[in-house]
Amino acid sequence: MPYPLQLGLQDATSPIMEELTHFHDHTLMIVFLISSLVLYIISSMLTTKLTHTSTMDAQEVETIWTILPAMILILIALPSLRILYMMDEINDPSLTVKTMGHQWYWSYEYTDYEDLTFDSYMIPTNDLEPGQLRLLEVDNRVVLPMEMPIRMLISSEDVLHSWAIPSMGLKTDAIPGRLNQATLMSSRPGLFYGQCSEICGSNHSFMPIVLELVPLKYFEDWSASLL
């Protein structure tokens, strides 16, 4: 859950987001070391009075500054590719949910169930109950079972949208005429918020997403009550 003046990422809710957080820290450490080295070299050049006017080339130095950046790029690329393939891999999902973007709301269809569909609109500020979040609450939450692999099929009925849940490391474009998919699995129960992350018109800011992750027994009771 985000909070005011937050500096870091949201707490990870899914295994994918945990991997992305580790990769972020790994990359940031490399960037910090490179920046420190560059600043040290610049400060040394500005403060020293020694010069090398007779130096025309330095093969050893040129070899080092060619090989070293290549090794650094490999250190960044390998974990990045691993996470990329993890995000794209969907093996035997326990549940499939199809979500369609509209101007300016989301509709959901649980394809494993017959006639389990609904639209999800933002609750206007004047209708909020005490404790509810402004611009983030919806009239129909997406209830899903926790600790189970879920496949999300994402598309759009009109213009470009983007279905994003930051705490789960999810951001998938909703493109008219194209069906994109994403893997979702929560390691803990709770409410998780997201928003449309593609400018889609005048009410783009009013397309929140709310996932309610619950134990399997509660999900079965909820789905049975709607059928």
Swiss-Prot record:
Mg(2+) binds at residue 198. The chain crosses the membrane at residues 15-45, 60-87. It is an enzyme of class 7 (translocase). Keywords: Copper, Electron transport, Magnesium, Membrane, Metal-binding, Mitochondrion, Mitochondrion inner membrane, Phosphoprotein, Respiratory chain, Translocase, Transmembrane, Transmembrane helix, Transport. Its cofactor is Cu cation. It catalyses: 4 Fe(II)-[cytochrome c] + O2 + 8 H(+)(in) = 4 Fe(III)-[cytochrome c] + 2 H2O + 4 H(+)(out). Cu cation A2 binds at residues 196, 198, 200, 204. Residues 1-14, 88-227 are mitochondrial intermembrane. It is found in: Mitochondrion inner membrane. Its EC number is 7.1.1.9. Cu cation A1 binds at residues 161, 196, 200, 207. The keyword Protease does not apply. GO terms for molecular function: copper ion binding; cytochrome-c oxidase activity. Binds a dinuclear copper A center per subunit. Belongs to the cytochrome c oxidase subunit 2 family. Component of the cytochrome c oxidase, the last enzyme in the mitochondrial electron transport chain which drives oxidative phosphorylation. The respiratory chain contains 3 multisubunit complexes succinate dehydrogenase (complex II, CII), ubiquinol-cytochrome c oxidoreductase (cytochrome b-c1 complex, complex III, CIII) and cytochrome c oxidase (complex IV, CIV), that cooperate to transfer electrons derived from NADH and succinate to molecular oxygen, creating an electrochemical gradient over the inner membrane that drives transmembrane transport and the ATP synthase. Component of the cytochrome c oxidase (complex IV, CIV), a multisubunit enzyme composed of 14 subunits. The complex is composed of a catalytic core of 3 subunits MT-CO1, MT-CO2 and MT-CO3, encoded in the mitochondrial DNA, and 11 supernumerary subunits COX4I, COX5A, COX5B, COX6A, COX6B, COX6C, COX7A, COX7B, COX7C, COX8 and NDUFA4, which are encoded in the nuclear genome. This is Cytochrome c oxidase subunit 2. It comes from Dugong dugon. The gene is MT-CO2.
